[in-house]
Amino acid sequence: MPGTDHAGIATQNVVEQELAREGISRHDLGREKFIERVWEWRSKYGGAIINQLKRLGSSCDWERERFTMDEGLSKAVREVFVRLYDDGLIYQGDYIVNWCPRCHTAISDLEVEYHQEGSNLWNIRYPYADGSGDIIVATTRPETMLGDTAVAVNPNDDRYHDKIGKEVILPLVNRRIPVIADDYVTMEFGSGAVKITPSSDPNDFAMAGRHNLEIIPIMDGNAVINANGGPYCGQDRYTCRENIVRDLEEQGYLVGIEPYAHNVGKCYRCKTDIEPTVSKQWFVKVEPLAKEAVAAVVKGNTRIVPSTWEATYFEWMTNIRDWCISRQIWWGHRIPVWYCDSCGKVIVSRTDPDRCPECGNATLRQDEDV
């Protein structure tokens, strides 16, 4: 049974590039007109994949060809969404996601490509608030220090036993933040003390939940520093990095720079560096599903060949994160959720509702995401 995917981000990018050559954007057209334009593009170029498969001699039942935006499949997507929502497996929440500043959308973990790049490890001096000295932290992203809300050390690190619970002064920002202890911190990395920026790192975000730390967003959707960045507001993240490093050095907070190679996450479509960002998204709870998948292999109902890959499979399944399914684009299956601004009711429906079942209001607003 042959078929093609609507490729939401990739297709929207191509059509937006066409519009850019005409000197307009999708926002100039509006959502409905833009989607019409995408369908026009699909009608013109969408058959290329099928024609290639036919030329390759693929033996398919071509009368059963499907496209993921066909009416039947669109109904199926809504059906699955509603069922999972009713079962408590789909929810909306503020969480840290992989944000592409170029595509202006969240993407899943599987849509992030990692490339090793040479960079630096900056060692920065954070003075103790009581004047008893300072603690050195190492970071590959000094620009994110604007959103620091703690410095963390390993609870088993003898070097910092008497420092846990103290406060330090965040350089350049002059904000007091605590020194906390967490098992996540690797004693061998840098000085053994790390800055915690919950709004810009998934691991820091998780640590903030464990220690009830404040989350301070420092960038907008374009990866430009926002008002929380003080004098750095309006600077893109890389310009801000240069200026932060310069100011740290001038004010005596920068104590060392070491060459450092690390993996940088990039958008799988446009290759822009991903910016971890806290935003409101729709998620699928995967832990209950992962438990069933693990049980299937343990019981022998599913076999992994070769069996040496079972350890990798179990590692992935036991350390899995909830799946972000919403995208801030226009081309795709729109989230089947409507909001009533009169009473606040959230309506999840297989069909487009014409009025609020709670208060009868006929003016409903559908979720913008796909």
Residue ranges: model-predicted function:
Residues D157-D158, C267, E358:
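Serine-centered coil/turn micro-motif
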Residues M1-P2:
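RNase H-like polynucleotidyl transferase catalytic core
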Residues C343-V370:
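Glycine-rich (often Gly-Gly/Gly-Pro-rich) flexible segments and glycine-rich loop motifs
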Residues D134-V137, P142-I196, P202-A206:
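Protease-associated
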Residues Q12, E16-D134, F189, A193-V348, ...:
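Residue patterns forming the tRNA-binding/recognition surfaces of aminoacyl-tRNA synthetases
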